[in-house]
From Swiss-Prot:
Keywords: Bacterial flagellum, Periplasm, Signal. This is Flagellar P-ring protein. Its main location: periplasm. GO terms for biological process: bacterial-type flagellum-dependent cell motility. The basal body constitutes a major portion of the flagellar organelle and consists of four rings (L,P,S, and M) mounted on a central rod. The lineage of its organism: Bacteria, Pseudomonadati, Myxococcota, Myxococcia, Myxococcales.
Length: 371
């Protein structure tokens, strides 16, 4: 098994400065940034087509389906030709895809993406011929055609080749015309908000905000991912206005504490609220200790304050028989990273330490390891 590439030695303080900065106060977001209305979504379209007008950079005669497609197209135009006789390299077979926006009406123009299927070297300068675009149900919803725009090139001579980006794929701006609308009537089906990041607390807050603004019983959190809406009788025939008012409501979204690490690159991203329980870790020559001490804040005699119980978190790190580095009181991933940074550790060391801390049950957060 080949060894994984070693990431560059980047100081932890620099690698984690943005991700582990001091948490900012939670900000409210509009409902339209947190959820989508069920049924109001884009639909994927696809089709098979031909790009012509290529300057010798199209498919070769070894691509049989391109030869058959050209012969079939010419046959529909009344020109009979054997597919084996098609030897032009000015044509390329392509897959054409597009996204049909919600509520798109016939006549609306949308962009399409084009990608080569054969061994064409470049689609630059090509023209996409009329291509029906179908949905998952097999019905044609749009028709694409137009000049292909490619953000790259492929040139070569004498065995040398120069390539930039991917010239075998491109776009046709406004290249498809919608011919059929998706059958969906807003207001006829039950109105449900689908949270983009399912969370019990966020769903409950959205329902509470809607009920506070539009009346009790207007919204109900069904589960962590869905909030069911019941418009008041006076708004039954005004689904658009009702949903527009709901979308503008501001809600403070909640989320689980999470740490995302990449073993391949040594990247560590920690969200707000990530905390470590008291734990001691030894990783190779590194030793890290996190502990929690009880503390009591006692007001002055005859003062107006009150006694408050708290905890004082401390973390320290050492390497071999070296000295100990003390950290401020706050057992967080930020403090752990700073302790390792002072010892010259790499981001990959932090990844390994976090995985061990999670396994020991001392990480109060979800740890997601990217491959």
């Amino acid at each position: 098994m080949p060894a994984r590439p070693t990431p560059p030695a980047v100081p932890l303080a620099l690698a984690l400065a943005a991700a582990l900065a001091a948490p900012a106060p939670a900000a409210a977001a509009r409902v339209k940034e947190l959820a989508d209305v069920v049924g109001v979504r884009e639909n994927a379209l696809y089709g098979y087509g031909l790009v012509v007008g290529l300057a010798g950079t199209g498919d070769s005669e070894r691509v049989l389906f391109t030869q058959q497609s050209v012969a079939g197209m010419l046959g529909r135009l009344g020109i009979r030709i054997d597919p084996k006789d098609v030897r032009s390299r000015n044509v390329a077979a392509v897959m054409v895809t597009a996204r049909l926006p919600p509520f798109a009406r016939p006549g609306t123009r949308i962009d399409v993406a084009v990608a080569s299927m054969g061994n064409a070297r470049s689609l630059a300068g090509g023209l996409l011929l009329v291509t029906p675009l179908s949905g998952g149900d097999g019905k044609v919803y749009a028709v694409g055609q137009g000049p292909v725009q490619v953000a790259g090139y492929d040139a070569g001579a004498g065995g040398a080749e120069l390539r930039k980006n991917t010239p075998t794929s491109g776009r046709v701006a406004g290249g498809a015309t919608v011919e059929r609308a998706v059958d969906f009537a807003l207001g006829q089906a039950p109105l449900v908000l689908a949270l983009r990041r399912p969370d019990l607390t966020t769903a409950s807050r959205v329902a509470a905000a809607v009920n506070a603004k539009l009346g009790a019983g207007t919204a109900r959190a069904v589960d962590p991912a869905a909030v069911e809406l019941s418009p008041p009788p006076a708004r039954k025939d005004d689904a658009v206005g009702f949903l527009a008012e709901v979308e503008l409501l501001e809600v403070e979204a909640d989320q689980r504490a999470r740490v995302v690490v990449s073993e391949r690159t040594g990247t560590v991203v920690a969200g707000d609220g990530v905390r470590l329980r008291p734990v001691a870790v030894a990783h190779g020559g590194l030793q890290v200790r996190v502990q929690r001490d009880p503390a009591v804040s006692q007001p002055a005699p005859f003062g107006a304050g009150r006694t408050v119980e708290a905890t004082r978190d401390r973390a320290a790190a050492a390497e071999g028989a070296g000295g100990v580095v003390a950290l401020p009181a706050a057992a967080s991933v930020k403090d752990l990273a700073r302790a390792l940074d002072l010892l010259g550790a790499t981001p990959r060391d932090l990844v390994a330490v976090l995985e061990a801390i999670r396994a020991a049950g001392a990480l109060d957060a979800d740890l997601e390891v990217l491959e």
